[in-house]
Structure formats: C-alpha cells, structure tokens
Regions:
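Histidine kinase transmitter module recognition
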Residues: 14-17, 91, 106, 136
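N-terminal helical cap/lid subdomain that shapes the substrate entry/recognition surface
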Residues: 1-84, 97
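A generic secondary-structure micro-motif detector
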Residues: 1, 24, 67, 89-92, ...
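Asp-based, Mg2+/Mn2+-dependent phosphohydrolase catalytic module
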Residues: 79-82, 86, 95-204
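Small/polar loops that bind or transfer phosphate-bearing groups
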Residues: 2-3, 29-30, 90-91, 148, ...
C-alpha cells in the first residue's frame, strides 16, 4: 500500500505544530511505529503525554486516506499467491485503526495474518514484527520472503533472517547489498509454485 502522501501530510503538520524541522521528522519516521517516532521527538515528555499525542495522531492518520492506493502490481501479486495457495501476511508498523483504514482504501484483500504495531513490543527496524509474522504463518523466518520499501522494514526483515526484496527503496537505505533482490516495481515479480515453497522470477 502506498500511503506516503498521508503519512507525510500528517507528520508534516505535527512537526510544524511543535516547531520541529519537517524534513528531519520525515527522514526519521518512515517504516517505524508512530509511538517510536513520538518518543524520539518528544524526549522530555512523560509517557502519558506521548500516549495522548499518539491517540490524536492515530485518529488523524486513520481518517485521512486521500491519496492512499495499492502499489502497481500489488493486487495481481496477491491474487497470484492466493491462486497458488501460497500463504502471505501483512506486517506493518501501523496501528489497527490506521492499517485497517489504509488497507480498505487501497482495495487490497485483508490477509489471514495481519501484524500491526499493537502486537509487538519492539517495532521495525527490530526483527520482532517479521518473526511474529513468520510464526503466525507457521513458517521459519528463513522460508519467508519480505517485500519492503522502507529502510526500517528492510533492516527488520534482514534481522529476522528472512529473504528480503527491496521495492523502490531509497538509494541510501542501509544494507541494500544484503537483500535478495532490489526492484523498482512489484510488476517485475512473477511467482510460481514449487513442490516445496515458491519460485520468484524477475521481469526486467
């Protein structure tokens, strides 16, 4: 799901309201849980104050879906996985209200395994979200392929021991040399079924 316009709109307004450098905030937040970013930029605040701020920001992000859409190739890829009976999950740094709202706006199907911020103590770039996703799928992390566009997500997938495909990731994202594939679009992915697992081909 491409929610970049919504994310940057919400956080830009939040940064301006607190007199913070907007670009500095935007450079930090991508792929991370909102609560992680709030704790980073509100170092002198109490946890209660941070939680109140989070509740307000969460409501803003959940209600604003203008510009949210499925990435090119995402719907076809998920349909192909379902046709081949290959299990898949969504592992997001968004909370339930935010992630549910954006998924609905994108028109993509909701998976059986949907990992959100509330389900892990440590979010991306820590490995916990993808470790939980693999566990819920009933697979070893090494048997899972993570598709990510954010630096924090790439680091999380690698730390979990998954194979990572970076799609339209920032050129300066760390550890890009360790990902299995680096692509510009999901349209380039073609998936086939093997006796055990899946085969991924790339259309250049």
């Amino acid at each position: 799901v491409d929610s970049l316009p919504v994310v940057e709109r919400a956080w830009s307004n939040w940064a301006k309201g607190r007199g913070l450098d907007v670009q500095q905030v935007l450079d930090f937040i991508h792929g991370k849980q909102a609560i992680t970013s709030l704790r980073h930029f509100m170092p002198g605040a109490s946890e209660a104050e941070i939680q109140r701020e989070h509740a307000v920001l969460e409501q803003v992000e959940a209600q604003d879906t203008d510009g949210v859409h499925a990435l090119p190739g995402a719907a076809a890829l998920l349909a192909r996985l379902n046709t081949l009976d290959i299990p898949w999950a969504i592992v997001t740094s968004g909370s339930v209200p935010v992630a549910t709202s954006r998924l609905a706006a994108s028109g993509l199907p909701r998976p059986a395994v949907f990992i959100t911020a509330e389900q892990v103590q440590r979010g991306k770039p820590e490995p916990d979200p993808y470790l939980l996703g693999a566990e819920r799928l009933g697979l070893a992390p090494q048997a899972c392929v993570v598709v990510e566009d954010a630096a924090a997500g790439i680091l999380s997938g690698l730390a979990a021991g998954c194979q990572v495909i970076a799609v339209n990731a920032p050129a300066d994202a760390p550890k890009l040399d360790q990902v299995a594939l680096a692509l510009s679009s999901l349209v380039q992915l073609q998936v086939g079924k093997l006796a055990q697992g899946a085969r991924i081909d790339v259309v250049r």
